[in-house]
Amino acid sequence: RNYIDKGLISKDELIEKLQSYGIKSIYYAALNKGDAKKLVLAYCFPPFNDTSGNVMAKRIFEDKQVVDVISNDMSRIRKKDQKLMNIMSHLLDSQIVLNGAQAFSSWQSIEDYIDGVLHAYKMYSDKYDEMYSRVMFPHSHFAAFELKKINQSIKWVAEFSDPLVTDVSSNLRHAPIEDDDYIEDLKAFVGPKYSDLIDDNSFNVCEVVAFLYADELIFTNKYQLDYMLLRYDEDIQELVKSKAIISQHPTLPRDMYQLVKSFYKVEQDKINIAYFGNFYDTRGFRQIELVAKYLYEANINNFTIHVFTNLNRKTMRFYNQSAFKDYIVMNQYAPYFEFLNLTDLMDALLIFDAETVGIKPYNPYVPSKLSDYRGSLSNIWAFTERESILDQTYEEKLYITRQHDYQKYASTFKQLANDIDKATYQVKNIKCSK
């Protein structure tokens, strides 16, 4: 670092020289010390394993700017995976990990995070030109808003991963702001023009303050933006659109897919399909079973569906009762970098739209796994809703079947099998009934 400070060598030149010597464990925190002009507010962040935190790490990687991060200890509700730091450790100046309450949306946990961020920021208030906050976890936008109030010149970029105020089933999310003074002070701050938008729902307030005061607003797709604006008047819609940027989740480079070697075994002569992800109310084991069912009924037997998910009694009960379990292998969810490596072993990766027909006017979601799948050597088999963002995506290696066009599952699979030059049927795979 002394050589850099004296101007004898640039940081990039020094890193390149160290790498040329075969040095892999470079202490980037020392090289980056004091360089961050951007502050990232991410309540949940690596090394704690969470989709939102991982995407934030990928945003930092994509942006290529050195940053400081203020996050929170999440050990009570999230597992730790130290390898996740490999995504962006080379761009980290410092990370302050707070010890506030840990919760998805409790007001106590939000207050603790705000207080911790304000305390940390005041020690380095002249350091930053920009801050970036990302939701999910509403804590991040609340803290960013408080910093914006005390430093209006700092650029605030606020990202929304999904619609915030309603969930995938269009149920209202509600978590009370348990501080009447905060609500009244906020109403006074926004003024009479917007005070009616402020209530005691932290999810609503989180969205409103970001819409009004962030300098840039990041959405993952146009339908998400349009859906979130439906409840606002034309003035706010125009304000938000003037600051909106559409940006799908970043994809990591190929070397990240080789960082952890998986020793998972697949039969090379079979067509190996994989599903990675949690099961939810609108996406569960039934979708996997239907793929196996309609392939089997089309006289296709040379395939295995490898499922990596949050195994629990309910899921395993469905699996054990399935007539098609011979074609499905259940596995516990894999750590992030092993998951990336596993994708390369497969012939196709399954991805499903959230089902929103009859629930929402259009589908405002893009499955987060798509960005990781794009970097894999494998093909992607997407099961879509009509006219969703995923349904309208055209890419090499992407095969699309509408979720409820069950009779087309086999034809899409046969096209995939033909493209990878594997048989769809083998006599040795015939299952004899007991």
Which residues are covered by each model-predicted region?
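N-terminal strand-loop element at the rim of the active site
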Residues: 65-115, 125, 310-314
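N-terminal subdomain of nucleotide-sugar transferases
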Residues: 1-90, 216, 295-298
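A short, active-site helix/loop in glycosyltransferases that binds the activated sugar's phosphate group
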Residues: 75, 197-243
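Acceptor-binding helix/loop patch of EC 2.4 sugar-transfer enzymes
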Residues: 157-200
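Nucleotide-activated donor-binding/catalytic signature segment of Leloir-type glycosyltransferases, i.e.
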Residues: 192-193, 300-345
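Conserved donor-binding/catalytic core segment of Leloir-type glycosyltransferases
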Residues: 255, 264-283
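Nucleotide-sugar-dependent
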Residues: 283-286, 339-341, 349-374, 381-391
